[in-house]
């Protein structure tokens, strides 16, 4: 059955009176057709329907099982990884899939992370509740990495010639457009110049001090697109742009590229992921922070996965993730301090991501988009319970967001200028839409006339100068995302949408018959989204009959070890490192090289800043890894080898919270600390409140993550010297 659409005209209503002047809104629905009203420059409400796996044009496929991992006691990290590597060695079928790894019922203990780094691999549980991956240890990374290789190669850069490209446009004029062809992969980059920053009031946030203000190049947006049509210099793309390109504020560019290392068509489904933690500390943070991290990947999915105890995110889509679907997922009982960069439960920094039918408890930012997420990104039919912070964009300029039938329990939905918060986030979004949402308060402000944020058919307390319509009223269609998708594909999508049934016919004066019927309904427990998700049946096969067991497949030895006995002997040899007369020697030979002093204060997370960052061992940015973020230790060791650095001069952070970089000697109002975090060698107590708003340190408790990083670095450096 097609999603119901009935005639509406969005207008501005208020309790007790109707405004006496006419106001035109940007969307009308009549005779089952959506009509978008463009402004005088051609800007209109975005088409969000290209979000998700394969731009939501296909259902998520059922991939055949090719290897089975039976339950076994002990550490299962290597067994599961070996099964994934086995599937990676298989030839893809015509659809690009190699096959699925089927995990048995039971609790699989893991000491390390699981990595999917080859296209066409699915990790599948036999039972969503009974197939459990339990991550142990003090590592704060992800339990599962769905991650390709960042080997993006820009081949050509073409100037955008169009003077103005409106919001939602897919066609633009470029220099030498004839050099392009249908199917080419391109990126469109919009610059962020000084004049544009000043026009938004984001150069200075107060105090006459510009340190936290946006700087030129900080907010460049880059959209990843495919060429659909070329007509002379006119190029048509497969998905709309979420912000207008205005030549008055700088020249945009179209880049052609090749990205061989990016993976695609991978999935994680039908299981429960749990982060183990120290039960003596209810706010323990020396455990796994992220359930699933998706990076350098497109057209992938996560579905029917439960998450428990993660301090950071259940799922985070990194800025190099695109066309990702996360659906029918539940996150409960997060374990962490209550503070900044924690409990960002369903979080995207990428584009064309779709989170649908997701449920989160006790998150701080349950449904969130991060720094310069280019969009569009959509959250459809998502609920939170006991939220501890707002949902929306939680950093700077994440544009083209849709919150469609989203309920935030006990906190806000926010589109606004965050000012200096989040290390100078400023305007958090533009051209975004709240559609039939509920929250404690909905904040909907607009940064500019051609960067309008809107809220239609929402229930809450309200604030903001964005575009509002039918507040505290139900509107149709029930889901704008699926109405747009049906219109674009010209077919019904009700089965895929699985919209939770709700009676939206409200009246304060029902007839006697209606009142009696409503009284009968009141005896039935209300169907919640959590139960609606739980009732969804998993379609793909979970039968292990006839599927190879990983324990019956011979393990392949690496070529280096198989062909070189001297290498094996070398790995078993422990070099003798001594200090003689103040000189460092290894096996009697003088070690020579430079030194590197770790950064131990200051830092930002903007892309421009990261390019200039220096390697660190105990710098921590939740959910994000790389230079200037949470450094991967092997990358630090490689840096030392390349630069002929012998000594890494380690020091703990001068202070933990980047708010302290202002040198103000004040107690902070809350625990919304700013990253990157330079860790201290001692752990938190979980008790009391320190001046930065987190719990006080326990000087008798070592910071297990801090010391494990130093140990791992020492071991890795030792291996590199052999």
Predicted features and spans:
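Extracellular "leader-to-stem" segments immediately downstream of a signal peptide or signal-anchor
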Residues: 7, 12, 21-281, 455-559
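Mature N-terminal, pre-catalytic/accessory segment of carbohydrate-active enzymes
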Residues: 23, 529-639
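Short glycine/acidic-rich loop motifs that flank beta-strands on beta-rich extracellular proteins
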Residues: 92-93, 112-113, 132-136, 236, ...
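Right-handed parallel beta-helix
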Residues: 120, 129, 192-224, 228-229, 264-354, 367, ...
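Aromatic- and acidic-residue-enriched carbohydrate-binding clefts of CAZyme catalytic domains
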Residues: 600-617, 660-708
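Catalytic domains of carbohydrate-active enzymes, especially glycoside hydrolases
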Residues: 631-656
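Conserved small/polar residues in nucleotide/adenosyl-binding loops
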Residues: 712-719
């Amino acid at each position: 059955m097609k999603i119901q659409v009935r005639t509406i005209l969005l207008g501005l209503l208020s309790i007790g009176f109707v405004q006496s002047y006419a106001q035109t809104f940007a969307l009308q629905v009549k005779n089952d057709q959506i009509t978008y009203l463009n402004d005088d420059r051609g800007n209109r409400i975005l088409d969000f329907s290209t979000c998700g796996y394969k731009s939501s044009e296909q259902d998520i496929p059922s991939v055949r099982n090719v290897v089975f991992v039976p339950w076994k006691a002990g550490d299962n990290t290597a067994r599961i990884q070996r099964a994934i590597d086995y599937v990676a060695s298989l030839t893809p079928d015509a659809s690009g899939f190699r096959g699925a790894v089927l995990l048995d019922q039971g609790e699989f203990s893991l000491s390390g992370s699981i990595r999917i780094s080859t296209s066409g691999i699915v990790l599948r549980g036999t039972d969503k509740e009974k197939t459990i991956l339990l991550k142990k240890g003090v590592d704060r990374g992800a339990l599962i990495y769905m991650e390709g290789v960042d080997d993006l190669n820009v081949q050509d850069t073409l100037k955008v010639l169009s003077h103005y490209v409106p919001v939602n446009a897919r066609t633009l004029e470029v220099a030498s457009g004839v050099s392009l062809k249908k199917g080419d992969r391109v990126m469109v980059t919009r610059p962020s110049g000084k004049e544009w920053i000043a026009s938004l009031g984001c150069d200075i946030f107060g105090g006459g001090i510009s340190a936290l203000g946006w700087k030129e190049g900080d907010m460049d947006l880059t959209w990843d697109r495919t060429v659909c049509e070329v007509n002379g210099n006119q190029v048509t793309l497969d998905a709309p742009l979420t912000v207008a390109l205005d030549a008055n504020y700088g020249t945009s560019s179209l880049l052609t590229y090749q990205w061989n290392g990016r993976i695609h068509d991978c999935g994680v489904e039908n299981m429960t992921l749990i982060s183990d933690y120290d039960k003596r500390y209810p706010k323990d943070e020396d455990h796994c922070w992220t359930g699933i991290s998706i990076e350098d990947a497109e057209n992938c999915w996560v579905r029917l996965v439960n998450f428990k105890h993660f301090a950071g995110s259940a799922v985070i889509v990194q800025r190099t993730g695109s066309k990702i679907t996360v659906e029918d997922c539940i996150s409960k009982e997060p374990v962490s301090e209550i503070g900044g960069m924690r409990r960002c439960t369903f979080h995207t920094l990428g584009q064309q991501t779709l989170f649908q039918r997701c449920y989160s408890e006790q998150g701080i930012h349950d449904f969130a988009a991060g720094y310069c997420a280019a969009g569009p990104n959509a959250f459809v039919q998502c609920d939170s319970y006991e939220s501890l912070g707002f949902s929306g964009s939680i950093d700077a300029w994440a544009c083209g967001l849709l919150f469609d039938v989203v309920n935030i329990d006990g906190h806000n939905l926010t589109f606004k200028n965050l000012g200096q918060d989040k290390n100078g986030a400023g305007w958090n979004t533009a051209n975004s839409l709240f559609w039939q949402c509920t929250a404690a308060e909905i904040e909907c402000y607009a940064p500019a006339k051609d960067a309008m944020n809107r809220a239609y058919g929402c229930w809450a307390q309200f604030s903001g100068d964005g575009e509002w319509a039918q507040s505290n009223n139900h509107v149709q269609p029930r889901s704008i995302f699926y109405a747009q998708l049906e219109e674009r594909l010209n077919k019904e999508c009700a089965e895929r949408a699985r919209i939770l049934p709700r009676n939206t016919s409200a009246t304060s004066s029902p007839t006697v018959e209606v009142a009696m019927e409503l009284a009968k309904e009141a005896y039935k427990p209300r169907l919640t989204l959590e139960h609606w998700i739980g009732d969804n049946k998993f379609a793909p096969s979970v039968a292990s009959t006839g599927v190879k067991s990983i324990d019956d497949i011979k393990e392949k030895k690496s070529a280096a070890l198989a062909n070189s006995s001297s290498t094996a002997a070398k790995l078993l040899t422990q070099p003798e490192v001594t200090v003689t007369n103040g000189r460092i020697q290894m096996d009697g030979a003088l070690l020579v090289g430079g030194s590197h002093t770790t950064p131990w204060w200051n830092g930002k997370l903007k892309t421009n800043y990261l390019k200039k960052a220096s390697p660190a061992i105990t710098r921590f940015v939740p959910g994000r890894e790389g230079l200037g973020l949470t450094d991967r230790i092997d990358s630090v060791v490689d840096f030392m080898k390349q630069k002929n650095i012998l000594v890494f001069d380690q020091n703990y952070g001068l202070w933990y919270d980047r708010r302290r970089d202002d040198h103000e000697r004040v107690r902070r109002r809350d625990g919304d600390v700013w990253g990157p975090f330079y860790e201290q060698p001692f752990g938190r107590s979980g008790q009391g409140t320190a001046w930065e708003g987190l719990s006080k340190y326990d000087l008798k408790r070592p910071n297990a993550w801090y010391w494990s990083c130093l140990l791992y670095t020492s071991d890795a450096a030792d291996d590199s010297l052999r």
